[in-house]
Amino acid sequence: MVIFYYFNSLGQEIITLPYDNTGLDYQGPEVEKKGYLTDKNNFQNISIPTIQVFLPRGNLNTKTAMIVCPGGGMRANAIHHEGFDVAKALNKKGISAFVLKYRLVPIHLIGKNEGLDHPYSKEKKQLAYGHLDALNAIAHVRENALKYEINPDKIGIMGFSAGGAVTMEATYKSSEKNRPNFLAPIYPWMKIVDDQEPPAYGPPIFIVCTTEDTFKLAIPSARIYTDWAEKNYISELHLYHHGKHGFGMRKTNYPVDNWFDNMVDWIDAIGMLN
């Protein structure tokens, strides 16, 4: 499938990734709606996956790259505080960022009971498409490493909430051409991810969550850490008490505000930054 490129009003490159919507019933275009705990709009009804490119300026470039997967329950994409704001912060650390708009549950199906057994059946089904978008994003960045001036062996993926589920599922299902070299699930929503073994190549993992998380994601986050640690894979878990779900890059005035700098220090410590 042909990959399309275009630029937004700020001159940032936006790439349309390969996709096949067989089995999905989209009606109408993408929709912008007021987001969860934010005054900025989130996107819904995303049927065409894209990545938006954020590159560090000049000599800042460390040749490290990160795919960023915003959250939103597979029904929305919180692209500002869990996407663009993250990308800009990564750029300041010399890391190239690629913000992913993965495919979401069709908007006309949100809130409808389809008589399926799993309480999150629509979201779980959508993960099968969303994780493919993440894998295609990694593959695209790796194939274009020279263009983006990055090291093809220093490509990470991070995601928030449902984006954390996309991050984990993509890692579990990855192959040599599209596997991440490291990953950072941030309060990952593991209820829609089946239990799986860490991949044999053992990518380093950095996990963040809080015990105050509205959706009780601390224990599943700890389980991910245990899975990695039991195999002696590089793994780090930052589990804070204070901090509600969905903080992203917003300040909470609690210790969890240090998560981003801690993550960058960890990326450096595992040899993926310099």
How should these model regions be labeled?
Residues M1-I14:
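Bacterial Sec-dependent N-terminal signal peptides
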Residues Q12-Y26:
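Short N-terminal segments immediately surrounding and downstream of signal-peptide cleavage
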Residues D25-V31, Y36-N42, S47-Q52, R57, ...:
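Serine-hydrolase catalytic machinery in alpha/beta-hydrolase-like enzymes
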Residues R57, G71-G72, S161, T211-D213:
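Residue-level signal for short, function-critical loop segments
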Residues A65-C69, A97-K101, K154-M158, F182-I186, ...:
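Structural recognition of the beta-strand scaffold that forms the well-ordered cores
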Residues Y129-Y201:
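Primarily recognizes the serine-hydrolase "nucleophile elbow" in alpha/beta-hydrolase
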Residues N181-L239:
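The feature captures the conserved acid-bearing segment of alpha/beta-hydrolase catalytic domains
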Residues K231-N274:
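C-terminal catalytic histidine-bearing segment of alpha/beta-hydrolase fold enzymes
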